[in-house]
């Protein structure tokens, strides 16, 4: 059975190495603060998603999504709450992660 041609396969959206490094660095600090315990990654043709869980048996507390189709409109990156509300959207991953960074500072300080 022949392999499907490369042009027949749909491209998969994924985080690049620097984006994933930044996300996993934040995840590690949230784990050290005792706030997150598990994560999940999902990649398909439309979106790359990182989901952070407080406990493994729950819905994700936060999702970080990369949607390249929106890069010219609102920005490719989005921070989505547990209930599906978009908390922050932007072109720069650091700006989208800023609310979590601020929460981490409060967790560590308090």
For the regions a language model picked out, list residue spans one by one.
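Short, charged, intrinsically disordered terminal tails
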Residues: 2, 6-13, 95-110
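Mixed-charge, glycine-accented linear interaction segment located at domain edges/termini
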Residues: 78-105
């Amino acid at each position: 059975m022949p392999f499907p041609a490369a042009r027949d396969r749909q491209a998969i959206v994924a985080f690049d190495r620097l984006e994933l490094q930044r996300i996993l660095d934040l995840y590690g600090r949230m784990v050290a603060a005792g706030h997150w315990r598990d994560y999940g990654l999902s990649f398909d043709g439309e979106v790359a998603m990182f989901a952070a869980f407080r406990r493994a048996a729950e819905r994700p507390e936060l999702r970080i999504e990369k949607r390249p189709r929106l890069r010219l409109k609102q920005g490719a990156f989005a921070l989505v709450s547990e209930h599906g509300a978009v908390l922050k959207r932007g072109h720069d991953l650091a700006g989208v992660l800023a609310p979590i960074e601020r929460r981490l500072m409060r967790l560590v300080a308090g």
